[in-house]
Each structure stands twice: as C-alpha cells, then as structure tokens.
C-alpha cells in the first residue's frame, strides 16, 4: 500500500503528500492516519492538488493530527459490514459499532459505500401500495412499495415522530426489515429512538446508522451512503423488500455544502455547492427497486424557513414518487400528524392502483377541503350566517374530515397518554365515505379529533354525551 504523510490540517480538511514514485490513491479511497497509541483517523480522498498532494476530508475529529504523521492508503473506498448480523446493531459512518456490543471481525463481509446505481435492465417498477396505517397518508398520498417518499416540513412540525411511527407500524404489521439512517440530526432523538425500538421489540429487524450533528461534515455527508449500502445488500443478495429511513436528507445537502466550501469550490445559488444536483442524483438513483428486491425510501426533508423554493428541498422533489407535506398551521390547530391534505401528493393515487372507490373518496375529500379553504375568507369577514345552506353543510363536513384525518401515534403514547391506532386502508376509505355521505352530520365534530376509525369516533362522541340519531343508526 502507498504511504504518505500529513502536510496540512485545516479543520476537517487534511492534505496528504505521497511520493511521486508510488501509485497515488484514487478519488474516494480511504486513508488511515496513525496517531500513535493505537489511535487512527480515517480520511477520504476528495481532490488531487498536484505534486503528489491529495486533499482529503476527515470522517472523524482531526484533533491531535500533526504535520509529518504517517498516512496509509487502504487501496479501496470506505467499506462497511453487511448482512443479517447487522440487524439490531448501531453503526457509525465507518461501519464501526457504537452500541457497546462486539465489533465485527476483520474477515466479516463488507461492501464499499461508493457503488454504481443498478443497470437499466435490472430495474423493476411496482405499483403495489404500502399500507402505513396512518389515515391521511393511506387515503390522500399513498406510498408505493419500492418508491421514494419525502416528508417535507420546517423545524418542529413532526417529521421525526412521523418517521418513528412508520418504522413502528411497518415492523409490527408487515414484519419488514428496516434501515434507519440518522444524518446530522440530534443525538438525543437517535438515543430515544434506539431505546423505544428496543423496548417494543422492533430493533431486531432494524439496522441503525448514525452520523449526528456534532460529527464532522465528512461523516454527515457519507453516512447516508453507509445506510444505503446495508439496505442494498438485503435487496441484491437476500432478495428482500427493505425500508430505508433517512432523517434528514437536508443535512446530507448541508454537509455537502460545508465540504464543498472547505475544498475551495465556488458556491452556487444560496451558497449551496455547485455539485448539489449530482450528489443528490448519485444517492437517489441507488435507492430503487430491482428484479431481486426493493428499497422503499422514506426521507425526512427539512425545509429552511418553510421555503419550498430553496434549492435543497427543490432538488430533492425531482426524485420523489410521493410527498407528505407537514404544515405548521395544522400543529397550531392541534391536528396531528400535521399533514397538509391538499399539498401532499402521490403518483399512486390512481384508480388503476388504489381502486375506483378509494380514488373517488380521496378526490371528494380533497374537493370538500378545497371548497372549505375558499369559504374561509368569507367566514372570517362576514361570518357563517352569510353562507348558503349547502355551503354550511360543506363547512361542517370539511371540519369533521379535517379532524378525522388526525390520529394518535403509538410512539407518542408516553407523551399523550392516549393509545396509538393503526387503521387499515379499507376502514379509512369507508369512514371518509360515510362522512361525505352525511351519515355523521349530527355527531359533534370534536369527536373526530385524534381517533382511529369511525367506531372510535362514535365511542368518543358517546363519552361526550352524544346519542346517535335514528338516521345514524340506520346508516351504521
């Protein structure tokens, strides 16, 4: 292996000089710096500066590095453990375990984090719906097995909680394998998620990879590739359907922006790296379904200052099959999950995929909510009395629909004191169909807030002192 030495350290950027008589390392190769006392730091080659000097990005803290320290070229990219043994374990960007358990032996199978996307002829398209048990998603923006889904929202609107609920529901109801990748988010949230999943028994079907916000930009930029590499093994070798959760894909872009500036590249719009679209494409094109298996990706996407035209979320949009948009106004109204039913969308909301009844109910729900939005200006200025009788009925049903789109989550039980609910798609469709038909016009609208199916809403109404009318009994 080629040997070099450290010649310059600027934060996470390390310049390494190799003799021109030896083979220079390739771009993306892993280099190891020996700090002494059995301590090493892993670098990744990013640029060749000339005269045998390679500019690298450190995957760890560069504290303690000095000029002249010996550097060894590994002759390959960073590689990480893959296989069934990774389930139930927690890794960092380098594939080292960080859960206090045993390290994987040196001869364990490892794959490179830098790989090509599957070839065109290997790809497979699927139109099978993935049931999540979350009403607003299953009804209005259904997820496709093997698709890419984006959870958009500003700070504190519930992206991470929604991802945790999806992991819980898919593990409990579908028994599927999941890979959770924490990219540049809070370490506390990752710690909470680990112990919650351990207690609920979901962890044994999940591999977790973390590169959190206190780590170097190199680690945050590459950790998504580490998680994806573990998921690709289950797809390509085991032939399984895998769920890949990334929280948060914006931090991947943000880390890339930091690295780009450190490498001296000229920034583009809003200070982002000029290679933004390329980096995003290289990651997203690997997240796909092949004839062997599928990777269904659910990505939380932070929207800076709630601005959807920002280049980071806008670049991500192009790769998605479905978008789930979280709205701060709904959190202020106490509607959770705060999914905006009019701005969320899915390519799978098609009668040939979800069925004619589901499609018609979803379309009518969106129509009623859109009409309610249009009437809100009149209501706020002139009051409800200025509406026609038909418009008053639309407003009443829209409010019931809006509340019924909310539900309690299993992962939030400790905070809310309310049991979470998983609602099958057929129950969701039949419930909204009955509300649209006017079967529950006399049921108090508050009864529909944060409940599971229609039966739960009627039980809540009964607790509120409501007695079913003969019409509702007949329809029920």
UniProtKB/Swiss-Prot annotation:
Pfam families associated with the record: ATP-synt_ab, ATP-synt_ab_N, ATP-synt_VA_C
In its keyword annotation, does this UniProt entry include Transport? Answer: yes
The top EC class, named as a word, is translocase
Recorded hits in PROSITE patterns, A to Z, give: ATPASE_ALPHA_BETA
CDD domains of this UniProt entry? ATP-synt_F1_beta_C, ATP-synt_F1_beta_N, F1-ATPase_beta_CD
The UniProt record gives the binding positions of ATP as 153-160
Q: Which domain of life is it from?
A: Bacteria
Molecular-function GO terms, alphabetical: ATP binding; ATP hydrolysis activity; proton-transporting ATP synthase activity, rotational mechanism
How does this protein lie in the membrane? Peripheral membrane protein
Transmembrane regions: none
Where found?
Cell membrane
Name a single GO cellular component: plasma membrane
As its record notes, the protein acts as a catalyst of: ATP + H2O + 4 H(+)(in) = ADP + phosphate + 5 H(+)(out)
SMART domains (alphabetical): AAA
* Gene3D superfamilies to which the protein is assigned, alphabetical: 2.40.10.170, Bovine Mitochondrial F1-atpase, Atp Synthase Beta Chain, Chain D, domain 3, P-loop containing nucleotide triphosphate hydrolases
> What's in the keyword line of the UniProt record?
ATP synthesis, ATP-binding, Cell membrane, CF(1), Hydrogen ion transport, Ion transport, Membrane, Nucleotide-binding, Translocase, Transport
Give the enzyme's EC designation: 7.1.2.2
**Subunit structure comment from the entry:** F-type ATPases have 2 components, CF(1) - the catalytic core - and CF(0) - the membrane proton channel. CF(1) has five subunits: alpha(3), beta(3), gamma(1), delta(1), epsilon(1). CF(0) has three main subunits: a(1), b(2) and c(9-12). The alpha and beta chains form an alternating ring which encloses part of the gamma chain. CF(1) is attached to CF(0) by a central stalk formed by the gamma and epsilon chains, while a peripheral stalk is formed by the delta and b chains.
**Family named by the database record:** Belongs to the ATPase alpha/beta chains family.
Q: What does this protein do?
A: Produces ATP from ADP in the presence of a proton gradient across the membrane. The catalytic sites are hosted primarily by the beta subunits.
Q: What is this protein called?
A: ATP synthase subunit beta
Q: Which species is the source of this protein? A: Latilactobacillus sakei subsp. sakei (strain 23K)
Q: Which gene encodes it?
A: atpD
């Amino acid at each position: 292996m080629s040997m070099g030495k450290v010649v310059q350290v600027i934060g996470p950027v390390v310049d390494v000089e190799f003799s021109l008589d030896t083979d220079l390392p390739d771009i993306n190769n892993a280099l190891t710096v020996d700090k002494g006392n059995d301590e090493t730091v892993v670098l990744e080659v990013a640029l060749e500066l000339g005269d045998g000097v390679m500019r690298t990005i450190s995957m760890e803290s560069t504290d303690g590095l000095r000029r002249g320290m010996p550097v060894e070229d590994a002759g390959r990219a960073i590689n990480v453990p893959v296989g069934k043994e990774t389930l139930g374990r927690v890794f960092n960007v380098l594939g080292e375990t960080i859960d206090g358990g045993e390290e994987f032996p040196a001869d364990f199978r490892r794959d490179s984090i830098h790989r090509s996307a599957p070839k065109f002829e290997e790809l497979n398209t699927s139109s099978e719906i993935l049931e999540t048990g979350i009403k607003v998603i299953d009804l209005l923006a259904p997820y496709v097995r093997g698709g890419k889904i984006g959870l958009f929202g500003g700070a504190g609107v519930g992206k991470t909680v929604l991802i945790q609920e999806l992991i819980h529901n898919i593990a409990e109801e579908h028994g599927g394998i999941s890979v959770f990748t924490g990219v540049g988010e809070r370490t506390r949230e990752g710690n909470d998620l680990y112990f919650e999943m351990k207690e609920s028994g979901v962890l044994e079907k999940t591999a977790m990879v973390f590169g959190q916000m206190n780590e170097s930009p190199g680690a945050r930029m590459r950790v998504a590739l580490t998680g994806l590499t573990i998921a690709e093994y289950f797809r390509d070798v085991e032939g399984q359907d895998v769920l890949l959760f990334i929280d948060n894909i914006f931090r991947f872009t943000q880390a890339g922006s930091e690295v780009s500036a450190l490498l001296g590249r000229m920034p583009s719009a809003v200070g982002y790296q000029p290679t933004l679209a390329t980096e995003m494409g290289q990651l997203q094109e690997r997240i796909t379904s092949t004839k062997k298996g599928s990777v269904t990706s659910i990505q939380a996407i932070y929207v800076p200052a709630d601005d959807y035209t920002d280049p980071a979320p806008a670049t991500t949009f192009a790769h998605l099959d479905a978008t789930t948009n979280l709205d701060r106004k709904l959190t202020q109204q106490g509607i959770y999950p705060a999914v905006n039913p009019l701005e969320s969308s899915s390519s799978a909301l098609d009668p040939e995929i979800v069925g004619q009844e589901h499609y018609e109910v979803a379309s009518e729900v969106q129509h009623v909510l859109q009409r309610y939005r249009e009437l809100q200006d009149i209501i706020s200025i002139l009051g409800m009395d200025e509406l026609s009788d038909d418009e008053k009925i639309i407003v009443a049903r829209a409010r019931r629909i809006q509340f019924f789109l909310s539900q309690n989550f299993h992962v939030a039980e400790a905070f809310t004191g309310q049991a979470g609910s998983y609602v099958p798609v057929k129950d969701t469709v039949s419930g909204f169909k009955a509300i649209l038909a006017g079967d529950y016009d006399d049921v108090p609208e508050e009864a529909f807030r944060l409940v599971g199916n229609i039966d739960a809403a009627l039980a809540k109404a009964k607790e509120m002192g409501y007695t079913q009318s003969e019409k509702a009994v007949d329809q029920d």
